[in-house]
Amino acid sequence: MVEADGYILRIAKKEWIEKVYNSAMYYTSSPRKWQKGQTVLFLAKTEFGDAFIGYGVIENIHSKEELSQEEQRECDTWGWRKALEFKYIIRFNKPLALKETSLKDLGLRGKCLHGLPLKADQLNALIDQAEG
């Protein structure tokens, strides 16, 4: 299997969006081969439907056991197993609606896109489209 250059991660709750941006951390149970340097595109429900709201580059991957007790309790509550720490996170000025991207042809929506692996050319095309 070819390794991914990055992934799509969906931020499921509106209140978690600011938490991700403020802490540069994303807690997940998604069983992927996370690696330092991978790019993650953030997807969230917006007024336009599902839309890309930004992206980040992974700096570190922490197991639940490496986290603070408070973080471990939150992980237990939500079933998360890892924390992705980002080197930086960029918020798009305007969300990029999924239906305006090449990914619309996949016929996937919402949680079905969570954890979807992407190659570098797909990542770059989506980021360029969102920032363009």
Task: Describe each region flagged by the PLM.
Residues 46-57:
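Short coil-to-beta-strand transition motifs
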Residues 32-44:
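Short coil-to-beta transition motif at edge beta-strands of beta-rich domains
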Residues 11-12, 43-45:
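Acidic/polar N-terminal loop/beta-strand segments that form early-domain functional surfaces
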Residues 1-35, 51-53, 64-132:
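Contiguous surface segments at macromolecular interaction interfaces
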Residues 59-63:
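Short edge-strand/loop segments of extracellular domains
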